[in-house]
Amino acid sequence: MPRGSALSDTERAQLDVMKLLNVSLHEMSRKISRSRHCIREYLKDPVSYGTSKRAPRRKALSVRDERNVIRAASNSCKTARDIRNELQLSASKRTILNVIKRSGVIVRQKLRPAPLLSADHKLKRLEFAKNNMGTNWSKVVFSDEKKFNLDGPDGCRYYWRDLRKEPMVFSRRNFGGGTVMVWGAFTEKKKLEIQFVSSKMNSTDYQNVLELELSKYLRHYSRKDFRFQQDNATIHVSNSTRDYFKLKKINLLDWPARSPDLNPIENLWGILVRIVYAQNKTYPTVASLKQGILDAWKSIPDNQLKSLVRSMEDRLIEIIRTQGNPINY
């Protein structure tokens, strides 16, 4: 039980007078609304009352326990309960959280998605970066597919980020089952029209999308001046799709596998998602979601496209610096 406040000078003076008048302890307690124990302690030694220091409150965790808590939380997805049980501590979950917060080096952070990379993937990414340092990125059409859900973007994943360490990542498969799939593309100066596609799109479907939008766009430019960027999804690199590119004389950018962090359209998708789901908006029907996507796509200003494309050189530098490992873009 917490201790009450010390008697004030006025209360002490009242007690001194009441003691001279032989007022009972019970009556003193009633008159000044203080406990009999408090009054008794004062009357026992009025001179030294209030001069002794209270013993400091015992800490729930020792210094060693706190170090173990920080070590257990470091770059992990453990909850405060998990950490408490793992270390067999009697402290509350709030105490565990306070220790982590006071550490100054661990914060709650969302897991950053990144592909699983083999040594060969990293080597190909590194080679791509070195070979394309002089590429004119304003002449590249960047493309990708994106999934949207009626009830908002995919769930967030958070963990205890140790600021002294590299951020953790999580890996996920493409096309895990959504409600609306779109194909999009853009250049430094222009967004191509969004195309709604099937999540089970095959090579022929993909070629139809390219014919409908990419070929229409390239008709206004010299094809030899432009290169088309796509990832290495099966329908993108199938024999029939390769034949289509040859027939249409569309030059391809030799893109390294598992490299969404290199593609600025991933950042454009992020901008689009924030607009589509602004203020935690959800959509009752597929039709309303599609309209929301179209409206959001049109609202993105062209000056943002230029800054995204111009980030390519910085991305390549980061790939070289990290020797092909995932980069934070």
Swiss-Prot record:
One of its GO terms (molecular function) is DNA binding. Its main location: nucleus. Pfam families: DDE_3, HTH_Tnp_Tc3_1, HTH_Tnp_Tc3_2_like. One of its GO terms (cellular component) is nucleus. Residues 2-135 bind DNA. The keyword Ribosomal protein does not apply. The lineage of its organism: Eukaryota, Metazoa, Ecdysozoa, Nematoda, Chromadorea. Binds specifically to the terminal nucleotides of the TC3 inverted repeat. Its expression results in frequent excision and transposition of endogenous TC3 elements. TC3 transposase acts by making double strand breaks at the ends of TC3 element. The excised element would then be inserted into a target sequence. One of its GO terms (biological process) is DNA recombination. Gene3D superfamilies: Homeodomain-like, Ribonuclease H-like superfamily/Ribonuclease H, Winged helix-like DNA-binding domain superfamily/Winged helix DNA-binding domain. It comes from Caenorhabditis elegans. Belongs to the transposase 5 family. Keywords: DNA integration, DNA recombination, DNA-binding, Nucleus, Transposable element. Homodimer or homotetramer. SUPFAM superfamilies: Homeodomain-like. This is Transposable element Tc3 transposase. It is found in: Nucleus.
